[in-house]
UniProtKB/Swiss-Prot annotation:
Keywords: Metal-binding, Nucleus, Repeat, Zinc, Zinc-finger. One of its GO terms (cellular component) is nucleus. One of its GO terms (biological process) is regulation of DNA-templated transcription. Belongs to the CONSTANS family. It comes from Arabidopsis thaliana (Mouse-ear cress). Zn(2+) 1 binds at residues 14, 17, 37, 42. This is Putative zinc finger protein At1g68190.
Amino acid sequence: MLCIIIIENMERVCEFCKAYRAVVYCIADTANLCLTCDAKVHSANSLSGRHLRTVLCDSCKNQPCVVRCFDHKMFLCHGCNDKFHGGGSSEHRRRDLRCYTGCPPAKDFAVMWGFRVMDDDDDVSLEQSFRMVKPKVQREGGFILEQILELEKVQLREENGSSSLTERGDPSPLELPKKPEEQLIDLPQTGKELVVDFSHLSSSSTLGDSFWECKSPYNKNNQLWHQNIQDIGVCEDTICSDDDFQIPDIDLTFRNFEEQFGADPEPIADSNNVFFVSSLDKSHEMKTFSSSFNNPIFAPKPASSTISFSSSETDNPYSHSEEVISFCPSLSNNTRQKVITRLKEKKRARVEEKKA
């Protein structure tokens, strides 16, 4: 039991400096601090300055105080207050204490602890005022007097430092402020480094072109399908022996394109309102073949699906296999040249008809 009483009455050391006796309790930080460290910690910013703090009990030196007894000249917590004033001594003069915020000056702490301070003359320091304190009071409150004097030195040092910075920041009264034009002249000429030359770039950029409008060296007109659907190189000599066979102006659509190619259709409209749906199969190698105008394009892998031809006038579908309309990469050079020549003649004839 004796050991417990000794532990409860042990003086708490400041948790910040570990040197002085703790006299202040911060509720937000749950920390015991001395006066100097209390000012340093809670003057760092405005948020820390809002922390509620109170003085530690002078009796148990452990709990935050709630009342000051002027007869005992002590700050007391709830338990110590009941212990001292639970009997007939309840007539003692007491005053309830409230928590404080911010960073009070050292003189306010001196007044709170009951020391007489000369308020009329601010030039008189606390050290000069404390010289008039009785030796008995100095012995009893020597630790708090030391902390108050140390706090005053810190606050005076900070005030002198801030005033010197203010004086250095103020311009000389003999020096006129510069005009805005002169201030711009004094700035380093670093704007030239930010100039970027875009002359090497072409005026018409092709970065936004779609996949179907890619620029091919074989297609001077930069179009994927320049001729009509009839101009595609068809193996008329080998497969389509009937010279009267022609593809009419009809709508060409791929049925089951999602099942066949695994992608959504991307229609491209030409002059005859023909829609060509195509997709590249990523799981197979893409093979190149020659078209009627000798342009290498990519062909999807042949499949067993059907192509439905439906005229705009009639709704009777004609189903043909893909072998009916197919490209023949195995043609000889002479046959291909004949096909190209015939197609050029057809094209020239159409151009003349349009001009007429």
